């Protein structure tokens, strides 16, 4: 994670600290007791709204610690598509209160959290990076696990992650084995948008592989194998719709796919995060069209 991303997360938590329960003519409840300015909330991207929602739940409780996806967004860690607003938390002791005392849309997990695994920033408590990664295998989805692995391997060596998993206590062995296999087997992608697209495709058992337009700097399109040397290319636009990041000319990925004569599915990152089902529907249509085309005699193409 770069300095700009770290500064953005710190600034967002500081903004929430100022906004929380400040007098407002148009408040928006992020928890049952915490409000922010509605216009400010609506201006935030969905992942930032998740950070604010988790921060509100942590503030409302004297001891609750954010877990899994909700701790991941506090770190800027990559996660799978949005699921719901139910926040996962735990108490340090691991003993949840009676369900009648749970705040609205909050789920207490029966897992202890040590002091050395807890980070506190602006009165927000959440687990550290490596503990968060393990919790994604306990409570997260396969897309959470795949994208978080890409992110984690850009911050830690494989050996460091394997050693942490080996030393982790209080978790079922099969969960730790799954984490080991994923860390060992993933080729990390350097961009969240392509990491997320690959994770969504993999969760639907669709094989794909990345093209690196420049080694170790940025990934090109994802290539989906339709069988028999037939392929389609996936291009995910960033938040600005531009393809010129990392110093590449505008639309380099589209030029690459055009040069290789691949049919292309182009999708927006924010839509992929919020509605992956629509993305998969479009990929399915493109695959079927390619397979149908190649089932015809060549003079009918």
Summary of predicted features, one role per range:
Residues 154-301:
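Surface segments flanking catalytic/ligand-binding clefts of nucleic-acid enzymes
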Residues 1-171, 288-301:
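Short gly/ser-rich loop at a beta-strand->alpha-helix junction or flexible surface loop bordering the NTP-binding
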């Amino acid at each position: 994670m770069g300095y700009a991303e770290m500064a953005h997360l710190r600034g967002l938590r500081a903004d929430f600290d100022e906004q929380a329960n400040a007098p407002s003519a148009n408040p928006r409840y992020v928890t049952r007791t915490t409000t922010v300015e509605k216009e400010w909330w609506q201006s935030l991207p969905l992942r930032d709204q998740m950070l604010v929602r988790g921060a509100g739940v942590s503030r409302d409780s004297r001891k609750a610690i954010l877990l899994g996806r909700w701790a991941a967004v506090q770190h800027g860690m990559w996660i799978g598509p949005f699921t719901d607003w139910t926040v996962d938390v735990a108490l340090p002791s691991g003993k949840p209160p009676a369900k009648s005392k749970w705040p609205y849309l909050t789920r207490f997990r029966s897992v202890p959290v040590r002091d050395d695994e807890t980070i506190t920033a602006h009165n927000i408590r959440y687990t550290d990076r490596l503990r968060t990664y393990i919790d994604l295998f306990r409570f997260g989805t396969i897309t959470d696990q795949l994208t978080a692995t890409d992110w984690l391997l850009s911050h830690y060596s494989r050996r460091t992650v394997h050693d942490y998993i080996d030393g982790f206590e209080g978790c079922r062995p099969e969960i730790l084995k799954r984490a080991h296999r994923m860390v060992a087997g993933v080729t990390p992608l350097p961009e969240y948008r392509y990491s997320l697209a690959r994770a969504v495709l993999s969760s639907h058992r669709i094989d794909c592989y990345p093209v690196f337009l420049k080694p170790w700097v940025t990934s090109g399109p994802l290539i989906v194998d339709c069988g028999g040397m037939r392929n389609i290319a996936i291009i995910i636009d960033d938040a600005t719709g531009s393809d010129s990041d990392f110093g590449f000319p505008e639309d380099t990925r589209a030029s690459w796919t055009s040069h290789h004569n691949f049919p292309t599915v182009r999708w927006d990152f924010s839509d992929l995060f919020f509605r992956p089902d629509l993305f998969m529907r479009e990929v399915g249509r493109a695959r079927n069209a390619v397979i149908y085309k190649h089932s015809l005699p060549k003079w009918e193409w």
